[in-house]
Amino acid sequence: MATEEIDMSYWDVSWGEFNEDKNSSIFCESHPHIVNSHGIWEVMTFKRGMNFWEYPLPNLEILIFSTFFIWRLLDISFNKIGLRVPRFTYMMIAGIILGQTCHFSNKSWIHDIFFPDDNRPKVAETLGAFGFVLYWFLKGVTMDAELPFRTEKRSSVIGFITVIIPLICGSLTFRYRERRGDSSILRMEYRLIIFLQSISAFTSIDTLLKDLQIKHSEFGRIALSGAMVTDMLAFGVTFFNAIYYEKLYGFMQTVGFCLFVVVMICVVRPAMYWVIKQTPEGRPVKDFYLYSIFGIAFACFTFFNKVIHLFGPAGSFVFGLTVPNGYPLGTTLIQKFESFNLGSILPLFGSLTMMQVDLLRLFKESGDLIRMEGQIYEVISFILLVNTTKFVVTTITAYAFKMPLRDSFALALVLSNKGIFELAYYTYAVELKLIRPEVFTILAAYTLLNSIFIPMLLELVHDPTKRFRCYRKRNLGILKDGAALQCLMCVYRPDHITSMTDLLETFSPSQDSPMACNILHLVELVGQANPMFISHQLQKPEPGSTSLSDNVIISFRGFQRQFFEYTSLDIFTSVSVSQHMHEDICWLALSRSLSLIVLPFHRTWSVDRSTVISNDDNLRMLNVNVLRRAPCSVGIFVYRKPIVESHMAKSHSKICLIFNGGKDDREALAITNRMRLTEKRTRLTIIRFIPKSSEMDNDEWEQQQSINLKESVTSIVGSNIKENDAKVTYIDKAVSDGSETSRILRAMANDYDLFIVGSGSGIGTEATSGISEWTEFNELGPIGDLLASHEYPSSASVLVVQKQVYIHHTKSQRRKSF
């Protein structure tokens, strides 16, 4: 095979410990060789040698600094004007800028730095490829490996259709063009375009959602679940094609991959959990384990690349899936490697890849797009056809599953996004000579434009402030009889432990009313420590030490022992700054599909209510943030003790429900009814405040309206509250303004152990007229604020309930439903 001769006259290679043969076709290194120069004046001092940028280390440093400076400058500038684009897009743009700068100064030293005309090893390209493999591994670590098995029907169908329909459409179009016989694109190039434009790569979607800060949302979960389904289909299509086209060799590839997955599941995954159990609670994972995992990740890359001849980074990604995400192992790996990789190494991959794009050629051929001819028109038109099909079918499918039209558009945009995976695979295909450089230029340019404009369009159609809102109902009102109550109890201070356990006891779990309790201990982050999210089911304290959540664990385990047959209990600790605690609460509720979050009230008083013991503004802000963003119903619990009397064998628990018929009151009724499903003797009083009529006296009016109250309550909760139940009392009170409401509530202050009320109860009616303006704590609503106030003469506890706000679609496309 003939060897191409390369002009080496520019380089004084012998000075840098390099050698070349007589015709300059073979380039060798002498080891150990010099990696850096003798100084910037080397040529002037020694009258020979190389410029300092010609040595490997300075050249690498210049490339790293150049790419970092440009992409960070773009990132800061775009953020200043309010345009949020994935960071990898800026890295690609940096490559375009550097590449075109070098092309315009073809004979200058700038061109020699970025495009050295020699056969020396490309250190920067190798390091960039290393960064890409590390990036794929870390993406696997951040992903929940069990997500595909928990994917709901909606995400599975969306993921399936968004791949299959574009694949079919693209294949039919390709066959039509092939029959015409005038195609300038090779068969393999067509197959590659169809495949990569039809799938939605998880890594690209995850990067987009993370950089736009909508990953931890119901919308983000659907998008990631759909992307994961497309990835699984992509693996299936890959191996089907391998077996179909390459017969035995393809079959051996498939077998090798299956064996690899079996080893990951049966050997590596249990080993990861063993590492977690060896790590004491609150302590970092040993460096030995971290670097061993790091080494195995690149061994998996080698196995895929050299043994079964598949896309190498996919091996590191699959291995990353075996690492349990979250604290301590997954979080530690991310904290240790991600920032360095994204800041220094990965930009080399994005920039150096895009530097190979021949932008001048694209501009010269752009006229062919208008004339609808030529190679560029054929590629772009085919890409647009496949992507338009993908966008339309995704939108229709999402809308058919009751997603709002705007969110259906947004989901279609997300699943149509192209980014780091597609660019890497195009580069891989060029190396394997599956596609030609001129086609690569078109595909890379399209990928760049796609990654710029889709995030901008997404900003227009998607509202990120509602990222924790759900598309499905998650509240107590929809729970069927016998269904477990999925709840989250939050503990901020030690005195909240007793209040939350007492409230749980009022539910008294039974066979007809089981509970799945999740306890979250909130610890404020101080100093320079890293945030942590600890699952006490997986991690145990170091022998001889205690956990910072010991009191929480012991107390709630005691509650579980009381009702062990009908209660499951999971305890977590979140250590974070107070400004972000609400995100941990909402994300835990979202990820575990909970129906109720219970938060402690931020103010507590002495037993005689004469002084305020604590008034924590941080806790109040936490409660407000959760109420605004919660994916399910929320209760704020004001603890004032008498609720504990309900556990006494001979006593009745006296509960008062204030029911004015609003959405929050209906949820409060559902919670109250849940408490009545227990075996305990509970006396319930349901009070409703109605407008006073001038045509009849109060007693006659209230007696007539109490019948309607019974019918309303029975219609909401069904047969659980019987019409003639002696333990349920219905009271209608006619009022003309809020002062009468206050007087009535004060008169019954000492008659009950627990008051339950909706946060929106009575708003806009005579019941709250005149007192709404004096509300101190708006999150409780006017009646809840009255019951929780310092002046209210009662020692009864108060539970204020807000029903879930969920996103749905109707014919009028309203964004919220109650």
UniProtKB/Swiss-Prot annotation:
Expression sites by tissue: Preferentially expressed in pollen.
Tree of life domain: Eukaryota
Pfam families in UniProt: CHX17_C, Na_H_Exchanger
Any one of the GO BP annotations: proton transmembrane transport
Keyword entries, A-Z: Antiport, Ion transport, Membrane, Potassium, Potassium transport, Transmembrane, Transmembrane helix, Transport
Membrane-spanning residues: 51-71, 88-110, 123-143, 156-176, 192-212, 222-242, 248-268, 288-308, 310-330, 340-360, 376-396, 409-429, 438-458
Protein localization: Membrane
The keyword Transmembrane is assigned to this record: yes
GO cellular component terms attached to this protein's record: membrane
Record carries keyword Cytoplasm: no
Broad class of the protein's primary localization: membrane
Bilayer topology annotation: Multi-pass membrane protein
Gene Ontology molecular functions: antiporter activity
Function in brief: May operate as a cation/H(+) antiporter.
Similarity comment text for this entry: Belongs to the monovalent cation:proton antiporter 2 (CPA2) transporter (TC 2.A.37) family. CHX (TC 2.A.37.4) subfamily.
Name of this protein: Cation/H(+) antiporter 6A
